[in-house]
């Protein structure tokens, strides 16, 4: 990734005032900037609202120049861009440093969605080197709303090298992005301080940063699939569920792949997601609401490359902040490390560590893993699984360090699984078996077999 883009993502808040000052007049208007003429942008310019129906629009931004969509207020969906009937909308740099800014766009009314961009009927959005700042939707998708039909092919929404900051869904879902029945690709992005607010009827308000869901009632129809790669979530909030991410589906599980790949080099290869919270319609952060993520009928894979680390949460925060909750399935793949520092006791789905390491940084923080499945089928009850028969060539490890951990349901370790308990640490399980390696000076207690 170009170093200028890295700088914009890491230092966006400090760069914003001087950046805006250089682009706008003292009154905040874009009067000093010429209107865009065509889609091949050679100089800073202000675009008008775009409306596409079944056709294509491709913007190309020259190095060092800005395409600006700002200050557009509408009482219909799509503050700056409206797409329908399989329209295709693309913004990309000609080389590396051309940038696009969507700022202070809004749509009013609880049924109007997409503060900056609205897309329906299988329209596609492809964006690179983009900043979304302070866009507001009266309904869903503070910055982007995208609805499709889960057709096979390329992603319906593709956003790379982007910053989403301070976007708001006022009476809906997806503070920054709301997508339904779509395939989504997000890479090298940053989501900071986005919010999803609820209505007075205490509905919606899910997905402080992103809400990715599927409501197709046909079980034979494929569910949606989202890839979130090398992307940071910080300070996002939801009055409902899923402070950073909310995901659910009506029939087949929605699929999400959260990855840190070999190319990620910031912070020594350590990506940190923290200070995300969800209230669950209450007065403060709730573990049951999923401060980081809430999984309904969904399957989430954390794929962390060798030598890379994804850290979710901070042990110095309240345990509800950056928590994971819900009933879906979590799978850890890739030989890198996943560190969970929040209180995840309201995650009751199953967890499988197939490769690499999962570290629990907070005591008694994953107690109820597997509860949903075990309640449904007590005779075939699985909670947390370390290692795999099918992936025998991999090495999987659960590291509890010196924490105290209790697992209400089965803890199962295969031959390629390792349980590390440091001195002072303790793991207690009500049932289970471990055919792999147990290391460290801590203690493992299995109440029954």
Predicted regions and their residues:
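Right-handed parallel beta-helix
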Residues: 34-35, 62-71, 88-106, 124-136, ...
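Small-residue (G/S/T/A) turn/hinge positions that recur once per unit in extracellular repeat modules
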Residues: 57, 65-67, 86-87, 123, ...
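Glycine-rich beta-solenoid repeat tracts in large extracellular/virion proteins
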Residues: 48-58, 79-84, 115-120, 142-149, ...
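Extracellular beta-helix/beta-solenoid repeat scaffolds
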Residues: 59, 65-71, 87-89, 98-104, ...
């Amino acid at each position: 990734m170009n170093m200028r883009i890295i700088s914009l993502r890491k230092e966006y808040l400090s760069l914003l005032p001087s950046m805006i000052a250089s682009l706008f007049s003292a009154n905040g208007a874009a009067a000093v900037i010429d209107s865009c003429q065509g889609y091949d942008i050679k100089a800073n310019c202000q675009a008008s609202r775009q409306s596409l129906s079944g056709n294509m629009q491709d913007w190309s931004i020259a190095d060092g120049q800005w395409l600006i969509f700002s200050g557009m207020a509408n009482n219909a969906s799509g503050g700056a861009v409206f797409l329908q009937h399989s329209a295709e909308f693309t913004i990309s740099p000609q080389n590396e440093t051309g940038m696009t800014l969507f700022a202070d766009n809004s749509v009013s009314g609880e049924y109007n969605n997409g503060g900056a961009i609205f897309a329906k009927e299988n329209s596609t959005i492809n964006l690179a080197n983009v900043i979304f700042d302070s866009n507001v939707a009266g309904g869903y998708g503070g910055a982007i709303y995208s609805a499709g039909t889960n057709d096979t092919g390329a992603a319906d929404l593709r956003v790379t090298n982007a910053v989403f900051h301070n976007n708001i869904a006022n009476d809906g879902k997806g503070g920054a992005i709301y997508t339904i029945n779509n395939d989504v690709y997000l890479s090298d992005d940053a989501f900071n301080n986005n919010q999803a607010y609820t209505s007075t009827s205490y509905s919606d308000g899910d997905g402080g940063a992103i809400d990715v869901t599927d409501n197709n009632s046909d079980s034979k129809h494929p569910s949606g699939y989202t890839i979130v790669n090398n992307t940071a979530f910080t300070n996002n909030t939801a009055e409902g569920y899923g402070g950073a991410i909310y995901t659910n589906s009506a029939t087949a599980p929605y699929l999400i792949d959260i990855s840190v790949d070999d190319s990620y080099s910031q912070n020594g290869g350590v990506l940190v997601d923290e200070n995300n919270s969800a209230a669950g319609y209450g007065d403060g952060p709730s573990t049951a609401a999923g401060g980081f993520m809430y999984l309904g009928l969904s399957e989430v894979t954390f794929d962390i490359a060798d030598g890379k680390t994804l850290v979710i949460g901070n042990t110095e925060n309240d345990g509800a902040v950056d928590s994971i909750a819900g009933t879906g399935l979590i799978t850890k793949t890739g030989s890198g490390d996943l560190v969970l520092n929040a209180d995840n006791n309201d995650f009751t789905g199953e967890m499988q560590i197939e490769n690499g390491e999962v570290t629990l940084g907070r005591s008694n923080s994953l107690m109820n893993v597997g509860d949903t499945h075990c309640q449904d089928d007590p005779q075939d009850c699985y909670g947390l699984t370390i290692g795999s028969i099918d992936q025998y060539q991999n090495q999987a490890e659960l590291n509890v360090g010196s924490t105290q951990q209790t697992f209400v349901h089965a803890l199962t370790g295969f031959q390629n699984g390792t349980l590390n308990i440091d001195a002072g640490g303790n793991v207690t399980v009500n049932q289970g078996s471990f055919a792999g390696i147990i290391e460290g000076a801590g203690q493992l207690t299995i109440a029954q077999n």
